[in-house]
Regions:
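N-terminal soluble domains immediately following signal/targeting peptides that reside
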Residues: 3-153
Length: 153
């Protein structure tokens, strides 16, 4: 199999003060996840997001994400705990969707995002981040050179 040419991840962060919830959705190409965790893009032995997922697969994924990804809301780093995981597409285009959700009683005044996912593997990796805080929407492109960005509201 040939690797997909697009070295990209997508992250969407949403905070609605009415619901008092901060939601993070992260979409990663499954081939890249396998490359990062078992060093073989075509090896699907972990079965992430599938009925036959191996017991330690989610832990391995979280260990990796904790090294390359974080969100700080109002200066406090959020502990990564996967609320839901889904697999969409197939073959080289299969994407793993992760959702994280956090109650947030206080108004969001700043969000700091680090998304260096897969920059350890691919020099041309780009990580697109969309941030929606109530009616304020912004988009960022994070990469190996610029892995962190802070937004102030």
């Amino acid at each position: 199999l040939q690797a997909h040419p697009l070295k990209l991840s997508l992250c969407q962060i949403e905070y609605a003060s009415v619901e008092k919830t901060l939601t993070i959705e992260l979409r990663l190409f499954l081939m890249d996840v396998n490359e990062a965790l078992v060093f073989d893009p075509d090896n699907n032995e972990l079965g992430l997001g599938q009925p036959d997922e191996v017991p330690n697969a989610e832990g391995m994924l979280l260990d990796y994400l904790n090294r390359f990804f974080y969100i700080k809301a109002n200066g406090k780093q959020l502990a990564l705990k996967i609320k839901s995981m889904s697999l969409n597409g197939q073959g080289n285009d299969a994407a793993l969707g992760l959702t994280f959700s956090y109650p947030s009683q206080e108004k969001i005044t700043s969000i700091e995002i680090k998304n260096a996912v897969f920059t350890d593997l691919f020099f041309d990796q780009s990580n697109v981040v969309y941030v929606h805080v109530d009616d304020d929407s912004r988009s960022l492109m994070l990469n190996k050179k610029t892995p962190v960005h802070k937004l102030v509201y």
